[in-house]
Amino acid sequence: FNKIEIPDFENTPKLSGKLSSVKASAKASFIGPLSQIKPIQTPLKKQLLVILSGPEPQRSRFAKDIIEEAVQLGFPIIVTGESKPLPHSKLVKALGYCNSSELEQLMNESSHIVCRSGYSTLMELAAIGKKALLVPTSGQFEQEYLAKYWGEQFNFPTSNDHEISTKDFVKYLNDTSDFERRE
């Protein structure tokens, strides 16, 4: 390679922790996070945005578990990223896949977000300065590491996709601490 571009900050705290650590090299340069999602001025809605991603069958199990737990709290839920029909109710609105401008609007207007801890999603959260309940896909070691790192470094709430519970949601929904926008 003639050039290595690293989508992270050179200085700490890095978004990717040890994953972007490199030995000094003239070829490597830190270019900051990459995100299609930008902060926009929009009224904040009290709703839980669930962004589904990852392989099946984990994706469908994740959707089912989150909806079952969150509905118990009486919180409006919007689900994106699911191709299969989801149970609709007064509180659940399933949108399927969203384009980037739709997702940008939803992420900016939602008071709460639940998502996987993939690096692209984390860069989007950093770009808009939003906290989320991070639930790594089991067996995806990068996601597991990043969820743990963001929990420790940026005080993000995390949960395990096999053990997500109403208690996790209540703790997250009551978390009023801020996350500084980083771009």
What do these predicted regions represent?
Residues 1-30:
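Active-site-proximal region of nucleotide-activated glycan assembly enzymes
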Residues 9, 53, 118:
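Short glycine-/small-residue-rich Rossmann-like dinucleotide-binding loops
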Residues 10, 81-83, 138:
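Residues in the short beta-alpha loop(s) of Rossmann-like NAD(P)-binding domains
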